[in-house]
Every structure is written in structure tokens, then in C-alpha cells.
């Protein structure tokens, strides 16, 4: 059990770090510039494995393409929200994907969470509700439409996570990562071409935060796909463990972006952490 738990924990903590890097990257470049180039750089890191990727079961490619489209929309929503919402609040709002993923895991995959998993979900939901009681944040007020975008992103990421569990039954983690990134790159390319989006290529390439983001993304996703491929792993539990990212985002919101209200956010994060611990018992 502990292998997939540790892999998922690595993903969660790295994801928290990625939110910091994303926000720093968005201070220099636009949302679509960051998305396209960080996806491109990430894909180039995987090109060496193309020989293995082409042996994927052809019938799985449409489902991988669908997963990529889901993430394509999720990332646009998530990046737009992150650019305008204080990091500490965004990180805890993103925890809502756990509730969505648990529901999808039960309905689609047929998982049956035990008493500890149900209790853990309830505790994490409490932490999210507590955050909602805090109306304002020193780093700026979160406008309703950006909160909606954050929730849409969380739901679509939960859909993607459920698809991962289905796909990794007969697609290796390296194959899934290669094709998923390739399709994602195609979607962003079409978005730029059809929308005639202007890109400051020179400035974006020099944005070193994007390079760091790409490396973190590739490492974290590979760990997550490996965890999903382990037969004993459960989406309902993995999703709760992923929320360890909220600890990183709350602390970074204060240390890096000087956001206020740290004590209350840490309390919310502590409640979330307690829920994670209970869920893996």
C-alpha cells in the first residue's frame, strides 16, 4: 500500500510547489503563453520515449485525447483563477476536487470508501467550508467568477484523475504521459492559431519559471500515473492524499506573496491535513 501512498504524496506536495511557480510565471507571461510553452517544454522532455509510446493500444488513443481536452479546459480555467485569486485561497478551493473525485470514483469505478475514507472526506470538506467563512484576504479579494473558474478546474481535474485509473489498466505510465502531452500541445496550438492569439515568444522563453514548472509537472505526473497503475490504489484515497498540496500553498502564500490571514488559513489547512491522515488509516 505504501508505495502508491508515497507516490501520491510526492505528487501532492509537488503540486503545491507548482502553484507557487505558476503564479510567479504568470507575473511575467500571459495565461496562454505559460500554458503553451510549459506544455511544449514538458513534451520535449518526453520525446526520447517515443519508441515505447507508439506501441500503445490504438483503441485507447481517443480516450487519451478526451482526457487531454478535459485538462486543456481545466488548465485554462485554473490558470485564469490562479492569476487573480490569492494563492492561499486558491489552494484550499482546489481541495474541492477531492469531493468531486470521490463521487466519480464511487459512481464510475465502483469503489466503496470505508468509514475512515468517508470521515476523512467530511473533515476535508469542513476545512473548505471554514475557508468560505473568511470573506477577505490581505492579498486581494477573490471575485465570484474567478471562484467559479477554480471550481470548474477542480471538477475537470477530478474527471481527468478518474480517467487515469481507467487508462492505466492497459496503458503504461510513460505511454499515457507521452500521448496526453502530445494531444494537449495540439489543443493549445489550435487555440492559439484559431484565436489568433498574440505571443511574446522571446519574453516567454526567457521566463525561467516556465522551465521549472515543466520539470515539476513531468516528475509529479509520472509519479501519479505510476501510483494509478498499482492495482491496490484507490482513487477515493489518492484524491484525499493529493490535498497535501494545500499545506504548501497556504504557507507559500504568506512567505512568498505576503498574503495575510495566515493563522486562520493554517487552521483550515490543519483541518484538511487531519482529514488526509484519517482517510489513509
Regions picked out by a protein language model, each given a short descriptive name:
Residues 34-35, 90, 176-177:
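Juxtamembrane helix-start motifs in multi-pass secondary transporters
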Residues 40-41, 46, 103-106, 116-135, ...:
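Hydrophobic transmembrane alpha-helices of multi-pass small-molecule transport proteins
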Residues 144-177:
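Selected transmembrane alpha-helices and immediately adjacent juxtamembrane segments
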Residues 40-45, 93-107, 183-187, 220, ...:
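Alpha-helical transmembrane segments of compact multi-pass small-molecule transporters, enriched
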Residues 12, 16, 47, 68, ...:
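Hydrophobic/small/kink-forming positions within alpha-helical transmembrane segments
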Residues 1-69, 75-85, 133-149, 182-231, ...:
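Membrane-interface interhelical linkers
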Residues 53, 78, 99-119, 129, ...:
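C-terminal transmembrane-helix exit sites in multi-pass transporters
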Residues 31, 87, 113, 173-174, ...:
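Membrane-helix interface/capping residues of multi-pass secondary transporters
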Amino acid at each position: 500500500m505504501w508505495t502508491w501512498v508515497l507516490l501520491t504524496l510526492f505528487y501532492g506536495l509537488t503540486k503545491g510547489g507548482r502553484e507557487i511557480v505558476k503564479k510567479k510565471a504568470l507575473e511575467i507571461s500571459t495565461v496562454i503563453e505559460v500554458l503553451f510553452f510549459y506544455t511544449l517544454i514538458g513534451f520535449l522532455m518526453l520525446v526520447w520515449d517515443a519508441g515505447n509510446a507508439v506501441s500503445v493500444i490504438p483503441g485507447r488513443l481517443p480516450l487519451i485525447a478526451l482526457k487531454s481536452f478535459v485538462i486543456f479546459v481545466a488548465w485554462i480555467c485554473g490558470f485564469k483563477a490562479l492569476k487573480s485569486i490569492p494563492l492561499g485561497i486558491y489552494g484550499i478551493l482546489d481541495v474541492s476536487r477531492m469531493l468531486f473525485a470521490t463521487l466519480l470514483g464511487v459512481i464510475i469505478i465502483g469503489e466503496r470508501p470505508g468509514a475512515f475514507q468517508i470521515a476523512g472526506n467530511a473533515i476535508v470538506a469542513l476545512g473548505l467550508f471554514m475557508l468560505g467563512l473568511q470573506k477577505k484576504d490581505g492579498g486581494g479579494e477573490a471575485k465570484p467568477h474567478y471562484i467559479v473558474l477554480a471550481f470548474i478546474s477542480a471538477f475537470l481535474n477530478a474527471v481527468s484523475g478518474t480517467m487515469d485509473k481507467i487508462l492505466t489498466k492497459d496503458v503504461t505510465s510513460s505511454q499515457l504521459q507521452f500521448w496526453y502531452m502530445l494531444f494537449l500541445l495540439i489543443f493549445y496550438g489550435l487555440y492559439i492559431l484559431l484565436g489568433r492569439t498574440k505571443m511574446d515568444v522571446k519574453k516567454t522563453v526567457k521566463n525561467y519559471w516556465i522551465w521549472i514548472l515543466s520539470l515539476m509537472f513531468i516528475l509529479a505526473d509520472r509519479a501519479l500515473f505510476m501510483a494509478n497503475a498499482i492495482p491496490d490504489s484507490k482513487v477515493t484515497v489518492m484524491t484525499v492524499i493529493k490535498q497535501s498540496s494545500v499545506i504548501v500553498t497556504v504557507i507559500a502564500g504568506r512567505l512568498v506573496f505576503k498574503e495575510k490571514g495566515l493563522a486562520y488559513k493554517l487552521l483550515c489547512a490543519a483541518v484538511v491535513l487531519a482529514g488526509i491522515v484519517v482517510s489513509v488509516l
